[in-house]
Structures are given as C-alpha cells and as structure tokens.
C-alpha cells in the first residue's frame, strides 16, 4: 500500500513538473531556403548578467566537448562568436552543434530561441548604363545627366558602414586631396584578409561616397566584411558585423548600408532594431527575387529603410522585390560605380543592391545638412514622408485592386542651399 502510494505521489510530482516546465522549443528557420546544416544562432533572454551568460556558454561548451568525444566523423565546432547589443540587450552566440548539444541548448532556461543559420547573398546583376545620380537630384530625367548637390554638406561629418564584401579602400574614388582615404576597415567576420575579393562592397561604397559616383562625396565609409569573395555569407556572420557597428558607430551621425539578404530571420530583424535603437539609420536592399519583401531579411525589418529598384524610365525593375514593406524605390538598373580589381576600375551592375546605397548616401547627405546630426526616426521620416505625386501610375499586383501606385517624387531642399535632392519612392 505504501509502495502504491509512493508511486502515485511520484506520478503526481511528475505531472506537476511537466505542468510547470517551459514550452518545448523548436529550431526556427529549420529547412528554410539556404539553411546551413548544423549551424545555429542562439538568442539568450534579455536581462541575463555577464556571469549568467558565461556560465551558460561554458556549460554548453563542456557538454559539446564531452559528446563530441563519443562521436565519429567530423565534429561540429561548438560555441563560436558571441554578440551583445547594448542598445536593447539582444544577445547570444553562434556555433555549430550536434543534435545532442542542440537539444541541451533548447532545454536551457537561459535561451529565448534558436534559429538555424542561413545563407545571405548580394543582390546584384551585371548590365550597362549610368544615370542614378541625375535621378536623385532632378525631376526632369532626360539626358544629359547631371547631379546637383550641396557641396558644403555632401555627407561631411558622417560615416556609412557598408556591411558587405569589403571595400578596396585604396580606390581613387575615396582618396582626398591630401592623399588620405575616406574609406577604412572596421570589421571582418569572413577571413583574415582585409580586401574586397568580390567587388560588390566597393561598388556600393562608391555609390554612397565616391567622389565621382557618390551621393555623399564627403562622407566616410567603413568596410564591415560579412560576405565572401563569392558574394555569400551566413546570417550569423551578418549579425556579428551588425553588432560591431552598433557598438562602434557614433549615434545620429552614422548610417548602416546592407545590400544583402536571405530567408526571413527573426535574429537578423532583431539586429536591425538594435542598430536603429543605437541611433544609426539603417538602409537595406529589398531583394531581387520579384516577390513580396515580407518573405526575406533584413528587408522585412520594420525599422529598416527598405529600398526597391527602378530603371532609368522610372519603372520598377523586373527583378525587384515589392510589397507594403518597401519604403523607397531608387536607381538600381545599370548603375556605374567603383570596382575592386584596381584603384581606377569601374563596373556597371544592377539590382536592389545598387538602389540601397543611393538611399544610404542620401541619408548621410541629410544628416550632414542637419545641425547636430539626426536620429534614425528623423531621417526615415525625411526620406519616406516628404512626398508628392509623380506623373503616371500603375496598379501594384500585390495590393488590392482599388489601390494604385502613385509614382512619388521625394523632393526636399537642404536647409543650407537651394540644391534639390529627389528620389522616387513607393
């Protein structure tokens, strides 16, 4: 009888334990497009002390090491790079884990969620033509193309962090009259080589701040290398780069430019929020899949300025993503800018990757024209709300039929001059 009673009590205790246990966690983004096998982003709960985080990661590292000794074949890497955004408390780590260690992580009370790492890529295609700077400074978009801007502002005093494949900082486009470069290296999550082996990042930087091809010709650009020479990387690497930017950029005088993307990611979108809350305006490419931008990151992040691409006729590029999350359409077809194969090399390519740096440069321009800098909300409002109707319109297939795209021309005057800066917006 006593035995039966004890069994009953144990059963009740077991039920009580299960009742008070936390929800069973699952890996988000598992099986998503571009998922990287056995690689994960672990997001910890906010408010954990440094000692609690260290205790957790040490325990997971020890567990992983013990399990790995019993496994055959290649072992996963274990706990890798850690991240912590002081602006919001968003923190965690990335790593490669076997199934047993992954389950231990999922069961840990310190963990908020676990996301499978995914591939991110550039958004560029090669074509011919040049016209983008003319389009952001004129309503009349007929040739010959010219660019009008406030030379006393022109991005002076601002820094744009190009989260991409790197920058050829010795390129002529970034050299000053005294022989120094406005381009510098900041962070590299890819390799130990501070160079742009692809060219994409150098092209974007040239559109932002090049002395010939740039929107903000006096801005500084910083290379944040998160993509390889092949133009791809991981969500984990991108988040690490964003973490570095959030902790090192000067609030209200900085812009982050991200001409990249991949599958929708809660972690990546959270990192966008962290950058925004750190006082850094963040501009991202919408993507080149001709789909709703709500399906990809960082384009789907609410606090990002998401940029689609138009061609020289002000038509939305056939490759551009679309949808209600697009804030701005900017020049993205046949854009000429600097390239990484030599200090004088240029190249013409297309994509929302090319549209994004036009707006990042414009954000830097607006910041430099504002006394004391400007916070991200102010710059976002400046770019997205100062609108009037552009001639012509067409229906958007992704909106209800009664809604129409009004071609909008953002036309705003710098407080320092009468030079007009224009850009097409959704």
UniProtKB/Swiss-Prot annotation:
Function according to Swiss-Prot or TrEMBL: Hydrolyzes gelatin, casein, the chromogenic substrate azocoll and the cuticle of the nematode P.redivivus. Immobilizes P.redivivus.
Domain Inhibitor I9, chain residue ranges per copy: 39-122
Family in the record: Belongs to the peptidase S8 family.
pH dependence of function: Optimum pH is 6-8.
UniProt-listed PROSITE patterns: SUBTILASE (PS51892), SUBTILASE_ASP (PS00136), SUBTILASE_HIS (PS00137), SUBTILASE_SER (PS00138)
EC assignment: 3.4.21.-
InterPro entries per the UniProt record, alphabetical: PCSK9_ProteinaseK-like, Peptidase_S8/S53_dom, Peptidase_S8/S53_dom_sf, Peptidase_S8_Asp-AS, Peptidase_S8_His-AS, Peptidase_S8_Ser-AS, Peptidase_S8_subtilisin-like, Peptidase_S8_subtilisin-rel
Annotated signal sequence range: 1-21
Thermal properties of activity per the entry: Optimum temperature is 45 degrees Celsius.
Organism: Orbilia oligospora
Catalytic residues of the enzyme: 164, 200, 353
Keywords: Collagen degradation, Glycoprotein, Hydrolase, Protease, Secreted, Serine protease, Signal, Zymogen
Entry-listed glycosylation sites: 178, 252
Annotated PANTHER family: CEREVISIN-RELATED, PEPTIDASE S8
Protein's UniProt name: Cuticle-degrading serine protease
Residue numbers covered by the propeptide annotation in the UniProt entry: 22-123
């Amino acid at each position: 009888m006593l035995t039966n009673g004890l069994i009953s009590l144990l059963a009740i205790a077991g039920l009580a334990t299960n009742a008070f246990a936390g929800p069973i966690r699952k890996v988000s983004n598992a099986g998503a497009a571009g998922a990287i096998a056995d690689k994960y982003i672990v997001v910890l709960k906010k408010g954990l002390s440094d000692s609690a985080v260290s205790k957790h990661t040490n325990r997971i590292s020890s567990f992983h090491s013990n399990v790995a000794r019993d496994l055959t074949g290649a072992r996963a890497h274990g706990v890798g790079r850690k991240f912590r955004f002081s602006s919001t408390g968003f923190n965690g780590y990335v790593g490669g884990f076997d199934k047993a260690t992954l389950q231990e992580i999922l069961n840990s009370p310190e963990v908020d969620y676990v996301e499978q790492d995914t591939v991110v890529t550039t958004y560029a295609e090669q074509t011919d033509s040049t016209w983008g700077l003319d389009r952001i400074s004129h309503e009349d978009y007929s040739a010959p193309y010219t660019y009008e801007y406030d030379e006393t502002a022109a991005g002076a005093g601002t820094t744009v962090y190009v989260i991409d494949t790197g920058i050829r900082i010795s390129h002529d486009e970034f050299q000053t009259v005294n022989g120094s470069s406005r381009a510098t290296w900041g962070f590299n999550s890819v390799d130990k080589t501070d160079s742009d082996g692809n060219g994409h990042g150098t092209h974007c930087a040239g559109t932002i701040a090049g002395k010939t091809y740039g929107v903000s010709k006096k801005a500084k650009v910083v290379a944040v290398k998160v993509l390889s020479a092949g133009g791809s990387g991981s969500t984990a690497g991108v988040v690490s780069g964003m973490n570095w930017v959030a902790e090192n950029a000067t609030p209200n005088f900085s812009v982050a430019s991200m001409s990249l993307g991949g599958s929708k990611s809660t972690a990546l979108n959270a990192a966008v929020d962290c950058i925004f809350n750190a006082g850094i305006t963040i501009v991202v490419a919408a993507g080149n899949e001709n789909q709703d931008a709500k399906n990809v990151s960082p384009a789907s992040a609410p606090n990002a300025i998401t940029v689609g691409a138009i061609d020289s006729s002000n038509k939305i590029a056939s490759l551009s993503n679309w949808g209600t999350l697009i804030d701005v359409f900017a020049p993205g077809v046949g854009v000429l800018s600097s390239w990484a194969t030599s200090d004088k090399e240029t190249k013409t390519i297309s994509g929302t990757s090319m549209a994004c740096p036009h707006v990042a440069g414009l954000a830097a321009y607006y910041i430099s024209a504002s006394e004391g800098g400007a916070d991200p909300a102010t710059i976002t409002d400046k770019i997205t709300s100062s609108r009037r109707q552009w001639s012509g319109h067409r229906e958007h297939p992704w909106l209800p039929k009664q809604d129409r795209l009004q071609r909008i021309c953002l036309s705003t005057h710098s407080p320092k001059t009468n030079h007009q800066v224009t850009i097409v917006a959704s």
